[in-house]
């Protein structure tokens, strides 16, 4: 199964400017993420950025990873993916994995899994993602942790920063309980077929997406489906603050 990984990244992150080049145990974070993608077995790995500085860092690596300088007027990572896909002239059925540039601990197995998932359901949907069970009420109540509700066919019903679904009356009476397996944490990695990607970037921004600040809600708003593969034993930390960077460096140091 053939798939391509694209890592959209910009230098001026709102919460943590310059984090793409933050040092993680001797290497810039974007390089660490690219290495994970290369280990996934992808046919091609492309870093998509509007930053010359980031492009130079990636280009200096002696690896098979590529870099593509995008326009600077994109409003989102998905728009960068669209520009890259069009420039490379990928076929309509090509599977693209959208990997965030702040995921240096992501497992290469997960990267391949989200591609395999879409390959298995591509006749019914153009987009797939991953989720895992929530492990604590603290995690379930954290608005930085995105939750997802799925139906019996594993299609997403809704994504939210709030705890969904809410078990009426139970959590109030059992505050120390573990969430049930039906409560899922979304893992922010996606796979798309190229023709679906082109539709996605043409859709207008939805009210729900603006409210939650979750771009994937645009797909549900426009009546399309997102297939969600539920996986176990996931450990991952996104680097979005200096504190999370320190935690990741400690984990790399313990390898």
Where are the predicted features?
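Short, acidic/turn-prone active-site loops that include or flank metal/cofactor-
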Residues: 11, 71-77, 233-235
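Conserved alpha/beta core of the MobA/IspD/sugar-nucleotide pyrophosphorylase nucleotidyltransferase superfamily
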Residues: 173-255
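N-terminal glycine-rich phosphate-binding loop and ensuing alpha1 helix
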Residues: 2-49
């Amino acid at each position: 199964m053939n798939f391509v990984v694209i890592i959209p990244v910009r230098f001026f992150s709102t919460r943590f400017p310059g984090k793409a080049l933050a040092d993680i145990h001797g290497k810039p974070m974007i390089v660490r993420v690219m290495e994970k993608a290369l280990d996934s077995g992808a046919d091609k790995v492309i870093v998509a950025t509007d930053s010359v500085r980031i492009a130079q860092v990636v280009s200096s690596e002696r690896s098979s990873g590529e870099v593509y300088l995008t326009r600077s007027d994109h409003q989102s990572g998905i728009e960068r993916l669209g520009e890259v896909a069009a420039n490379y002239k990928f076929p309509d059925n090509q599977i693209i994995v959208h990997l965030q540039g702040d995921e240096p601990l992501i497992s290469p197995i997960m990267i391949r899994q989200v591609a395999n998932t879409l390959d298995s359901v591509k006749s019914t949907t153009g987009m797939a993602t991953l989720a895992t069970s929530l492990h604590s009420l603290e995690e379930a109540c954290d608005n930085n942790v995105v939750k997802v509700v799925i139906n019996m066919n594993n299609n997403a019903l809704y994504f939210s920063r709030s705890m969904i679904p809410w078990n009426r009356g139970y959590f109030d009476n059992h505050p120390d309980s573990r969430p049930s397996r039906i409560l899922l944490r979304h893992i922010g990695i996606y796979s798309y077929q190229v023709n679906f990607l082109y539709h996605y970037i043409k859709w207008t921004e939805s009210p729900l997406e603006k409210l939650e600040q979750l771009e994937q809600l645009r797909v549900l708003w426009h009546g399309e489906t997102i297939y969600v593969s539920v996986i176990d034993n996931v450990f991952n930390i996104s680097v979005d603050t200096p504190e999370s960077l320190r935690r990741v460096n400690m984990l790399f140091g313990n390898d």
